[in-house]
Amino acid sequence: MATTALTASKTPGIIVAEIRMMSASFSGVHFLVEGDDDSKFWKPRVSSTSATIVNCEGKPNLLGASALIQRLGISSVAGVYDPDFERLFGVTHHPNILTPTDHNDLELTLIASDALNSLLHEFGDPAQIADFERNQGVTVAHYLEATSRQFGQLRYLSGILRHQVDFDRLSPYRFVSADTWTLDRSALISEYALLSGLTAPDVETLVQTHCPQAPNWCLSQGHDTVRVLAQGLRRRIGRKQISEQDVARVLRIAFSLELLQQSVMYRSLRSLETTLPAALFS
């Protein structure tokens, strides 16, 4: 199985041209993914002989290419995209050829599964985890969700109110202590207020007014959650100087075939597979 990528930045038109060019010598499935991490996850999981991964270099490109593919009647394409917060609004995209990840993005889908337990077994310290959970009164997973949600609420707020905040300035590494694995919410809110031209009380009011009481993980974002987890593993629940790239890699490995087959996205892709000219999975 090849993983197609161009050196220049892609556009929907370039992606479709790439698929057409490959179709001259390849009669299998062109599987659209958003980026490099998605490609790394799916490469060992789709068929090595009848499917090729197309890295679209971003969600806008993937959705734009999918719209063009449907207009042109190209029938050899399927794909997966991150729904982000769109699921809260009931928004879906091109269900005839695409399926969303189970949670807001692929990383979050992996974290919300039993792959998290495998990662904690590998990189966490059992005694420290037990002590942390005893003191907090919740599991590591529940604490991770509650902490990452607070970053996600601000992402949601920025999106719906068009605050255009640079979230590189709001990295969990700045606001979550590696020593205690606690969030300095006051500092986080103050920084968001500074970046959006608001006051901290205004931000708190907007969070209460506009952010829904959504189920677990629905207001979290994968990169934030991975960074929060990496901070905890460095001292409070482990003793590993582990990077977010390491966390993401181990989660991909730990997400077993059994976990994949239990996922909604897998069942949706299996359903789409019946319309494709070749097998997506081996």
What does each of the following model-derived ranges do?
Residues M1-S282:
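Acidic, divalent-metal-binding catalytic cores of TOPRIM
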